[in-house]
Amino acid sequence: MTTTITAKIAQRQQQHQQHQQQQLQHQQQQQQQQQHQPTSSMNGFRITGYPAAATPPARSNPIYAKPNAHELDLHISESLLYPGSTTQQQQALQSSPGPPPQLTSMLPSSGLPGAAQPIALKGNNPFLNSPSPTEAAPGVPTGLSSAQPATSASSGNYEMPEYAEPSRLRGLKQRPHSIAVGGSPAQSSFVDYNAQQQQRLLQLSRQQQQLRNAVTAAASTANGGDKETLYAALFQQYRQSPTNGQPAPPVPLHRKPAAAPVVPRRSQSTPRPPLQQQQQQQQAGINGQINGNGNQRPRSLDRFNGGLQSEAPPIPLRRFPNGNGNNNNGTLSRQKSPKKSSSADNMLMSPAGSQVNTMRHSISFHGGQETENGSKAEQTRPMSYAAPAPDQAYLEHQLRAYSEQLRTITESVRKYSEQAKLLSELKRQQQLAKQSQTNLNLLTPTTCNNSTGSNGNNNFQPNMISPEIVSKSLASLSTSQANEAQTPSNQLRLFLDNIRSSMRQEYQQHMPDDVLKPTSTLKRNGTDSLVTSNTAAKPEVEATPTPSDQLRQFLDAIRANKIPESVDKPKMTSSQTLDSFISKPLQMPDVTSGTPGGGVVGGQAASGGVAVNGQTNGIPTRRRPKSSIIPSSSNGKLEQREHSLVTSESFHQISDNLRLMSEDLQALSPSKAIPSSASSNSLKSLAANGGSSLTTELRVITSSPYSTSPKLQQMVMSKSNSSLGSVTTPSSATTTPSTAPMITDFNEILDSFQAMADKYKSKGSYDYLRKCSEALRQHSLQLKLQQQHQAHQQQQLPAHQQQQHQQQQQQQIQNGFASDDNSSSCSTTPGSIREAVQNLLLQPRNGFQILDDRMRLFIDIIDSQDRLSQDLQSEIETHRVVYDRLDGTGRKLLGSLTSQEDAVMLQRRLDEMNQRWNNLKSKSIAIRNRLESNSEHWNALLLSLRELTEWVIRKDTELSTLGLGPVRGDAVSLQKQLDDHKAFRRQLEDKRPIVESNLTSGRQYIANEAAVSDTSDTEANHDSDSRYMSAEEQSRELTRSIRREVGKLSEQWNNLIDRSDNWKHRLDEYMTKMRQFQKILEDLSSRVALAEQTKTSWLPPSSVGEANEQMQQLQRLRDKMTTASALLDDCNEQQSFFTANQVLVPTPCLSKLEDLNTRMKLLQIAMDERQKVLCQAGAQQTHENGDDGRTTSNSGTIGPLPNLGQSVKPPWERATTAANVPYYIDHERETTHWDHPEMIELMKGLADLNEIRFSAYRTAMKLRSVQKRLALDRISMSTACESFDRHGLRAQNDKLIDIPDMTTVLHSLYVTIDKIDLTLMLDLAINWILNVYDSQRTGQIRVLSFKVGLVLLCKGHLEEKYRYLFRLVADTDRRADQRRLGLLLHDCIQVPRQLGEVAAFGGSNIEPSVRSCLEQAGISQEAIDGNQDISIELQHFLGWLQHEPQSLVWLPVLHRLAAAEAAKHQAKCNICKEYPIVGFRYRCLKCFNFDMCQKCFFFGRNAKNHKLTHPMHEYCTTTTSTEDVRDFTRALKNKFKSRKYFKKHPRVGYLPVQSVLEGDALESPAPSPQHTTHQLQNDMHSRLEMYASRLAQVEYGGTGSNSTPDSDDEHQLIAQYCQALPGTSNGSAPKSPVQVMAAMDAEQREELEAIIRDLEEENANLQAEYQQLCSKEQSGMPEDSNGMQHSSSSMTGLSGQGEQGQDMMAEAKLLRQHKGRLEARMQILEDHNRQLEAQLQRLRQLLDEPNGGGSSATSSGLPSAPGSALNSKPNTLQTRSVTASQLNTDSPAKMNQQNGHYEHNSKNSSGLVTVITEQELESINDDLEDSSSSNTTNTTTTTTTTATTEKTCVELQK
């Protein structure tokens, strides 16, 4: 550390010497230039920070600000300060060089071709708070030129200048730090001046006034040559003037040099004081150089323009915001310095020529004044007005240095306290605003005051001081001078008080009383009385509230909705709140023009030009705030401009705003140097290092290229705004009760920032910040060059000055106050920041949005105050040692001082330091208390969370007591518990908003905090018990506690709600079950009572007939008791449920249940005994009749089940599987069959019916044969329904029924039939049902299928069957949806499917039928396709069935066939000559008196004159004479109809279904879970169905319309289906699609298996070849090859181990393979659906080959009549006609009696073999692909195998 300090000292000394040499050379050059430069060429002042707008390009060293300067340099154009400029000034401006090219588009021109227009300043100008030269005192005559406004002379005493009115007034209304009057430290951070301070102000003001008067008087007569001498004399006189016994104060300096005497920077034309003046100033006492507190007084404009009409600039009062109102030592407070060694007081002892790089300057000239010969002055520039002092000066320097540090800390404390207070209030008000939903209006009302000061308009603007008020105040100030001693302090105080008093009076005249009422009690503590010209006493001036108090008052007024509203401002609706207003898009006011008192001429207002008395004064336009007013013309009319976004032409106004606000912030709390590497993401480091300075925040943003987060930018801007709100609140707002100025300034500042960011940021924040860094880096280089130049000048100074300067620097380093040159970067230099921002503004930028989330950001800043307070406390502690050492050193020096004045001065300094230190500690304590009170809200939240958690736990315990105990099952107790739950839930609902609100607040709080470990209270408090917890630790502990409590409360609350819901559900369930239980008990009791009555009526049978009758009665009683037994079992189950769930069933219910169980057992025993008696009587009667027992004669007795093994005779044997599925063994042939021998014979007989041409009649004939053989035609539907209900099958349609239960039900049905073989009928019926619905013989079918299969074949009316079938699938509302309807149709279509006839009826896909039914019911196609929840009623279903749909047309045909069996028609068949016709009678409706019998029509026989195209009418009953006459009439009409008519109007006898290429099939119930494994291969019927269905679809795909005939015209359609076949059937050809499929199945199986084997062998060969190729490729890499071999061997070993010992792995592998095969088969099915249509078309063409010629001839020779078989769709009669004409025979294949297989003939089937081979090969290829992908690990092998397989398939197909 010592080495580093020594090196830095040596480096600094070397730089110091170089700087001194450069400075001396530079001073000589400047003096020579000043002697020869004319004053007429001066270009005025300029604003430092603009890129050399008025600087001559020829200057070699354009320095805008000194290095290490920590305040913003403010250089004001003299044209702005002196509105009465003459023509010579304008000519001087014209003669000056113009701005550089980059500023041409930025600065608006005022008509001068070569000069840039100076920029108007905003209200934060510190120089505009004092009178200007034009504002002369009343007694001093002023020499004004004719160009000055007439109002200056006419106003008399004191006139507000035109240029300064907006800026001055805005400064007064926006800066509370300008000059604060009144207030105590307890209420505000701004203190009153004590007597000593007022005395100093009085002296300063008096000297200033004298100097101004002298300059004004001499300006009119003095010429440019002697003005320099005049000013030097005036300055010297000013310094040496008597001040009531006190030393004359020096000319105040605006800047405070850090380590050298202050040398105000002058331009080359500025005259230097003569050498005598320099010596006198150097010899002046130290007391003359400093104020009472050791600070140098601020210096104003000490330069002036050389024009003849110009006047000396004013010397404004310095602003002292941090003075102490309680000290009586007469000191003036001063601003803090950002650096520990940057104070002007630290370097007063330096020699006159000494200078360091931290020197700061205030004013500079830009125009170079040269003489005619161009020579430069030789006068040397004085370095200071002070002379060297004795050793006491060093002590005072040390004291002032420490005081400077204490003052810095005090400023930080005040800043933090105000900021925390403001932001905490904002946070609290935001929460209140969200809950209140009050109409808020934050718009600032505007006012339009006329020139006469009339108050007729109520739209008063409280934040704007009108010129009238200032004039009145100045008048009262001049009047009051005669009544009291006029000192500068008193004058200034009276001036400000008059302004505030006038504003308050004018404000109170326009504002409502309720707005003034909340702040009317605030009074100032001072007792100063102000006397005006009109009144003897002034009203008391109210106390100065702090910004936080103002904001609190404002938000209180907002909450009370008492903000004054103007007439022309927009109103806010009831839905608008504070958040909605804050979050709205920001808009900036448009750029307006004009000056106070001046008129806007023409279009100059839009372009920025301002006309004053017809002339342009050169003042540029400036951006008006939203609340500002624009006086226009002399009559006082005001003009309000529209608001709009800031345009590129007004960016310099925005930059001006930023610069002025930066000056105010810098003046209040100069920023500390923050390293450029500071993290921009840390709000803590930002606030701790940079305070609230806008300069620091801009430095932090621009110094880090990674701070690209919009959130961070928003945070920085909002934080700056909060600092502005807490520090820069205007003084007028602090002394008036108005709250509008605060919110107006707040919004204006924020709008300025965001408008600039939104408008001028380019591609992104990264590019923007990068450009900022580059601009600052370039400026840093300029500053370094300036430092080197200064160091060079310092080297040229005398050696004793260098030595003294080095000693002073060494003392600073030893005391810890030396500043590192590297610590001051360009990023902290205000001028460089200003210049960087302005350079960036020159470039076009795209919009870069910054989130407008102000209030939320303020809450985030409030949350960081704990961390800031900790940093502040640590900073105070670090200065405690310095303070103690300084205090001790000062006390020791008091005894060694010889001069009494020095001792008094040192004593006063020590007292002041002690007092400030105590104030600092008290403020720190106050801040800590305030921050602790800020955490009270979160502590209250934590307490509330804990209380709610305890409440939830209590309620949970209460719920456990209520809901977990035993539940009484009676209705009264259950209802009482339901009421208790309702009351309990009401308590929860009442508490729900509070719980959710606390949970939401807690989650929001912990969301903004870093995640910490949720330890317990014991762990968290373990370390904190033994030591003091800092604020950060307390905050961390608070966060941890809130996080833990939020989680606990959330969990407990959710559990409580869930348990409450479960309790409610349980109570509802118990109530429902208990009511059902009691209802069933009552029903069961009545049933048992009725059965007992029947039991008492039993009598012994007296005869056999009576015994049979009693047996039937007993059976009916058993059926009833079966239902009662089911009810009793249900009751017992419910009682067990209640017992398991701790539900106390009422005692009467339990007693009744036990009694019913006993009575039911007794009844069962009695019925068994009764059955034995009746059976004995029945057996005796059977034995007497001599019957063998195989047939019964109307016995009606149920009895035990017969032995079904007797249903077959030897050599057949009946056996059953484990699932009770019967199968039959033929011992003679040693074969087994699923079908009964009688069933085989039956199916063989059905094959003979395949000769019938028409599918509907063929199917009906087959079903009629089955129906008769199974004796189902003798069982009525009502008997079947009763049997279903008797055996508990009601409402059990979705359940499964096994074979024993089916046998029981069938037995109950067959016992009602007389003279049948009961065992044979039962076995055949079971066989038929299993064939239809359980072809896989799983032993179980659905109850719905069992019922449908029996009802379809039993005896009953057709409509009754339809109604019953619909009732089976209907819901409780008697409606059926798509799914239920599909299940019903699926079970119905299985009957023709078993017979091989399903293809003619639309196939097994029932989706088209369901669609047809829904469309017939009036449901739209969109609803059907959208799978909406649609359903139909019974009448819709019946209406659809009356049209005889294609899928169910065989059922009505079956009923007509059964009705026509016994019908005899008195007519003769014209073909076979049968008479009478038995069965169906068919009459031709075109041929007169032409009848056909049933046999001739079915087999398609034809006559000479009759053709199949003729319409026919079918009769199933005997005709009447009326029908004969009607048929004759129809035949006569058809005689006159042509063939075209019948072709145009084809008619079918059923409702066709569009089944070709329909959508996916609806849900079809699988018979069992085992059906899907090998269903397509094992189930022959399924395969026949698939191929035949597609065949029929392709065959009849292009037929005609869907018209439906009337029932009366049915006979007319019969003739359409009559067409004789041209030849006999060829026995060698396939007779039907069934036979075709069977032939293909048998013949191609072996061939396909051979192909599969070949493909597998080829696959193995390809794999071997692939392995060889891989080994060859890897031969060059032995290591890899060995690794692969090793891996392969390892895997082989593992697989071997798995095959040997791991059975589970093998089983899993098999399951995966099985799953893959299933998925492959599903893919095969999908491929079949896509390809079968084309394949079956080829099949049809091949099938047409045997009789292709005959069919063609027949088709061409027949007319196309209605319903023609050649052009119509498949229908009831004609479908098989077309098929028969093409296939010759269309009957199912015959079955071999021996093995049950279908017989087939392989001749003439080569074409079929080829077609099916292609189809099967595709399936095999898919299987092989799946097998290869699952078993082969190499992808290339699989691909090669697949390609080879496809190639082989192609070859086979060829």
UniProtKB/Swiss-Prot annotation:
Identify its membrane topology class.
Peripheral membrane protein
Residues annotated as binding Zn(2+) 2 are 1484, 1487, 1506, 1510
Q: Where is this region: Disordered?
A: 1-65, 84-161, 240-352, 516-548, 595-650, 716-740, 783-830, 1012-1036, 1179-1209, 1673-1701, 1744-1854
Which portions of the chain have biased composition (kind: Low complexity)?
A: 11-37, 84-96, 276-296, 728-740, 783-814, 1827-1845
For the keyword Amino-acid biosynthesis, the answer is: no
Q: Where in the cell is it found?
A: Cell membrane, Sarcolemma; Cytoplasm, Cytoskeleton
Q: Where does Zn(2+) 1 bind?
A: 1469, 1472, 1493, 1496
Specify the superkingdom: Eukaryota
Name any GO cellular component annotation.
cell projection
Instruction: Please name the PANTHER family in this protein's record.
Output: DYSTROPHIN-1, E3 UBIQUITIN-PROTEIN LIGASE KCMF1
What protein name is recorded for this chain? Dystrophin, isoform D
Taxonomy of origin reads:
Eukaryota, Metazoa, Ecdysozoa, Arthropoda, Hexapoda
